[in-house]
From Swiss-Prot:
Name of a matching Pfam family: Hormone_5
Keyword Nucleotide-binding: no
Function description: Neurophysin 2 specifically binds the midbrain peptide hormone vasopressin.
GO molecular function: neurohypophyseal hormone activity; neuropeptide hormone activity; V1A vasopressin receptor binding
The organism's taxonomic lineage, starting at the top: Eukaryota, Metazoa, Chordata, Craniata, Vertebrata
Gene Ontology CC annotations of this record: extracellular space; secretory granule
Principal subcellular localisation of the protein: secreted
Species: Equus caballus (Horse)
Protein name, per record: Neurophysin 2
Gene name linked to the record: AVP
Key words of the record: Disulfide bond, Secreted
UniProt keyword annotation of Cytoplasm present: no
Disulphides: 7-51, 10-24, 18-41, 25-31, 58-70, 64-82, 71-76
Length: 92
């Protein structure tokens, strides 16, 4: 199993992470889908190694992207499992 790197940072102040070519999410930011904040994420298409963002798996092949939001590389859905305190590891 390949060690996956974190996907590229994106969004205001680089506080988000890319989840797909047009999806940028962060705990404090929520998710940007198809907006200017997510443009940088298209660069992932040119990088040879796979990446993964988010902590906890959710939905169909997605990962928790922000509070109450689950994203895969194509779309995001609301997901109660991804809310703060719903088994997410706490960051100090």
């Amino acid at each position: 199993d390949l060690e996956l790197r974190q996907c590229l940072p994106c969004g205001p102040g680089g506080k988000g992470r890319c989840f797909g070519p047009s999806i940028c999410c962060g705990d404090e930011l929520g998710c940007f889908v198809g907006t200017a904040e997510a443009l940088r994420c298209q660069e992932e298409n040119y990088l040879p190694s796979p990446c993964q963002s988010g902590q906890k798996p959710c939905g169909s092949g997605g990962r928790c992207a922000a509070a109450g939001i689950c994203c895969n590389d194509e779309s995001c859905v609301t997901e109660p499992e991804c809310r703060e305190g719903a088994g997410l590891p706490r960051r100090a």
